[in-house]
Amino acid sequence: MADLAAELDALDADTAAALRHWGFDRDRLLGWAERLLPGDGASNRVRGEVTPPLPEDIEALPERTSDEGRRLEQLGLEAIRRGELAVVVLAGGMATRMGGVVKALVEIRPGLTFLDARLAEREHWSAVADAPLPLVLMTSYATDDPIRETLGDTLDGRRVDAFTQGVSLRLTPDGHLFRTAENRPSLHATGHGDLPDSIRGAGTLGRLMDEDVRVVWIANLDNLGAAIDPLVLGKHLDGGAPLTVEVVEKVPGDRGGSPFRVDGRPVILESFRVPEDVDEDAVGVFNTNTFLVDAAQLRDLDMDWTWFRVEKSVEGRPAIQFERLIGELTSALRSSFLLVPRSGPDSRFIPAKDHAELDANRNAISARVAHYLTAAEQSRHGP
């Protein structure tokens, strides 16, 4: 890796300053290159005995109108009113899937962005709780400035806050810095698995806990189905596991994470981690990337993260980057897998990864957003 080290030492002053600003770790990249670069996709596959989850590993969310549902909903609502919940929205990444526009600022309908919808949701539940419910955004070097500029004074560091995930540099398959057509190094965000280290390193988690937050709700920016719901929160609190993972019934074409047992432990495995001789279709549910985690467990987390070698096509050429995934939390924290609705008015999975998916799900997303906005308006002005 001597050549790569020399290339890093020779970076121009502006690039080096930007990397320092965003927390680039030179030694970590050199370590990844030495350990992971010589591998291929097979190196990402998990080792050990991998089997489908047991029936008792996955529990369905109770009906809201059942006695149990009403009890759990009340339990969650009381926790919100005590100020014990904070929401962290994953708003980082590379801003590439929506034509170069930061997804938080993409309009769901004219005049209303994903960020607007999350703010309206926060406003509603703050009114219900009669106390500010914290909304925290995990941004990246590519999304942080536009989001902060848009939020302006709304980003007050208490009701609405933000911290950034990590950054690194892409490599060529033979271990040199990948350079763009303009001969610039190619930066990338290092995955949503950065969240635990980044939220702690920024001091954000400590501040939230000082304000009595007990549960951190983690959700993708672009899944507006993953809304605050006292029923889900109550189920998490009642279940006793430090980590709750929302899953939905799998449909053809789903690619991503699902629950498996690895050496007897229930965990989330991404598709690329599942051994080739294991039938993924034997697992009928799919991870929505929505998590509820006990704040104290997140604060005290001490785990050896698995970093993955990911091959991308950048400007039509192969590039290698290294990432970690938030689902790996299940390998360190005892986890409960909660089956939630995928369809209908109570759907908790309405993704919009790109323009095509946004267009396909626009009606469902608009209906959910209308509920947020109506609820927020009623909270401010009365029915």
Annotate each PLM feature.
Residues V102, R109-L112, P173, G203, ...:
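Solvent-exposed, flexible loop/coil residues
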Residues T139, G191, V293:
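A conserved hydrophobic position in a structured secondary element of the catalytic/binding core
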Residues T154-R255:
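Conserved beta-loop-beta/alpha segment of the NTase-like Rossmann-fold superfamily
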Residues R148, A162-F163, P345-F349:
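Aromatic-residue hotspot detector
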Residues L72-E73, G201, F322:
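Amphipathic coiled-coil/heptad-repeat helices and related helical stalk/stem segments
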Residues M1-D161, L169, F178-H188, P196, ...:
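N-terminal glycine-rich phosphate-binding loop and ensuing alpha1 helix
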Residues L208-N220, G225-D229, G234-G382:
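Catalytic core of tubulin tyrosine ligase-like
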Residues T139, T164-G166, L339-P341:
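A general secondary-structure junction signal
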